[in-house]
Design a protein with these regions (language model features):
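Acidic/histidine-rich, metal-coordinating catalytic segments
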Residues: 170-186, 204, 260-261
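RNase H-like polynucleotidyl transferase catalytic core
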Residues: 70-74, 176-180, 194-213, 229-232
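An active-site-proximal beta-strand-loop segment
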Residues: 95-143, 150
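Generic alpha-helical secondary structure signal
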Residues: 1-5, 21, 155, 159, ...
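Active-site beta-loop-alpha junctions of metal-dependent nucleic acid enzymes
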Residues: 127-128, 146-169
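Basic, flexible linker segments flanking DNA-binding modules
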Residues: 3-101, 207, 261-269
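Mobile genetic element proteins and their domesticated derivatives, centered on retroelements
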Residues: 6, 26, 41, 57, ...
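C-terminal domain-tail junction helix/linker
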Residues: 187, 194, 220-272
Length: 272
């Protein structure tokens, strides 16, 4: 080997890595947030006081082989619409999802998950779990939810009661939005909202864009803990969802919230 070539590579090997600290911090962030891409890692670094641009973060992530691998698995969307079984409400939200007032605009929906269990005959059977969350459009925080093994009016009403309680001190009249699912048409549901002077709002029939904020949450939830993972019991899946909702509310940062989590954003602006 020519001496010049040897000296060149020796200098390369002896060179101190100027990005060592950043790389270690990025590895730490990804360890705690396995689904963070370069944008959220950039936001987390910014929150920690590092001055770095997005392109450099992206370059380091590629160097370390930390690109997020996305899983997709098509599944039939749960449809809670059973026809007109009660009264429907007009669409008061009209896709105006943004608000700078906490607890003023709340939305809800139901989604289903599948898990697999071996029955008494030793046969693998598919079972379902249902999630009914209520979200504050102010910061995307899940303020209440219920989880059940079958669609249940009781579980939806339980989650509704908690959402009503959490938002009780709102200085403005509240609006609770949903699709036209059977549970939201129930007389007991609309009556409870009227008792609290809460406006009821519903999406137009078969128009998921009228509740896209909740559809987006369901997509993120399933992308990060469901697609590509097999759950073998109701309890295992339920615990995973509960853990994720806590993480989503308290730790998962969003660019639109200034790289804060929903809870961090709410607390910051409550103290301003």
């Amino acid at each position: 080997m020519p001496k010049a070539t040897y000296m060149y590579w020796q200098k390369r090997f002896d060179r101190v890595n100027p990005d060592k600290e950043i790389e270690e911090k990025i590895l730490e962030i990804r360890k705690n947030n396995k689904d963070y891409g370069y944008r959220r890692i950039y936001g987390e670094l910014r929150n920690l006081g590092y001055i770095i641009n997005k392109k450099k973060v992206q370059r380091i992530i590629q160097k370390l082989g930390l690109q997020v691998t996305s899983f997709t698995r098509k599944s039939r969307k749960y449809n809670s619409y059973k026809g007109k079984i009660g009264k429907t409400a007009k669409n008061r939200i009209r896709r105006r999802f943004n608000t700078n007032i906490p607890h003023q605009k709340i939305t809800t929906d139901t989604t289903e998950f599948k898990y697999y269990e071996v029955n008494e005959r030793g046969k693998l059977v598919v079972k379902k779990l249902y999630l009914d969350p209520f979200m504050d459009m102010y910061n995307g925080e899940i303020i209440s939810y219920s989880i059940s093994e079958s669609p249940s009016a009781k579980n939806i009403m339980d989650a509704l009661e908690k959402a009503i309680k959490v938002t009780a001190k709102s200085p403005y009249r509240r609006t609770f939005h949903s699709d036209q699912g059977w549970a939201y048409q129930m007389k007991v549901y609309s009556k409870r909202l009227k008792e609290e002077r809460i406006y009821q709002s519903m999406s137009r029939k078969a128009n998921c864009l009228d509740n896209s904020v909740m559809e987006n949450f369901f997509g993120i939830l399933k992308q990060e803990i469901y697609y590509g993972t097999t759950y073998n019991s109701y309890r295992e899946l339920k615990l995973a969802i509960e853990k994720y909702i806590k993480y989503y509310n308290e730790e998962r940062i969003k660019e639109k919230l200034g790289w804060l989590s929903p809870k961090q954003y709410r607390i910051k602006h409550m103290t301003v």
